[in-house]
Amino acid sequence: MESILNNSVITFVAYVGIISIYLFVIPLILFYWMNNRWNVMGKLERLGVYGLVFLFFPGLILFSPFLNLRLRGNNEG
């Protein structure tokens, strides 16, 4: 019985780890990368980013209110 409980806990921890990486870690890294490189990306890099956005969309939608990809002004006026 203890072996089954131990396996269940290990499985649960593994699922939580994978889900947290999928929903939190990789989307935050992708947001940081997009925010820094958005206006200077090449064609292939942009295509790769679009593919990653499609792949990690559920995690990205959690953080979408915090992303601003608009052009930065030159602080005049």
UniProtKB/Swiss-Prot annotation:
Membrane association type: Multi-pass membrane protein
Name of protein: NAD(P)H-quinone oxidoreductase subunit L
Function: NDH-1 shuttles electrons from an unknown electron donor, via FMN and iron-sulfur (Fe-S) centers, to quinones in the respiratory and/or the photosynthetic chain. The immediate electron acceptor for the enzyme in this species is believed to be plastoquinone. Couples the redox reaction to proton translocation, and thus conserves the redox energy in a proton gradient. Cyanobacterial NDH-1 also plays a role in inorganic carbon-concentration.
The encoding gene: ndhL
Subcellular location: Cellular thylakoid membrane
Catalytic reactions of this protein: a plastoquinone + NADH + (n+1) H(+)(in) = a plastoquinol + NAD(+) + n H(+)(out); a plastoquinone + NADPH + (n+1) H(+)(in) = a plastoquinol + NADP(+) + n H(+)(out)
Broadest EC class assigned to this enzyme: translocase
Superkingdom: Bacteria
Gene Ontology MF annotations: oxidoreductase activity, acting on NAD(P)H, quinone or similar compound as acceptor; quinone binding
